[in-house]
Amino acid sequence: LXRKNVD
């Protein structure tokens, strides 16, 4: 997505 590493 746009945060950490969640795509």
Curated annotation (Swiss-Prot):
Secreted found in the keyword field: yes
Kindly list the cofactors needed: Cu(2+)
Q: Mind naming one GO cellular-component term on file for this protein?
A: extracellular region
Q: Per the annotation, how and in what number is the cofactor bound?
A: Binds 2 copper ions per heterodimer.
Keyword rRNA processing part of the UniProt annotation? no
Locations listed in the record: Secreted, Extracellular space
- Predominant location of this chain? secreted
Q: Which family does it belong to?
A: Belongs to the tyrosinase family. Hemocyanin subfamily.
The job of this chain, per UniProt, is described as: Hemocyanins are copper-containing oxygen carriers occurring freely dissolved in the hemolymph of many mollusks and arthropods.
The protein depicted here goes by the name Hemocyanin subunit B
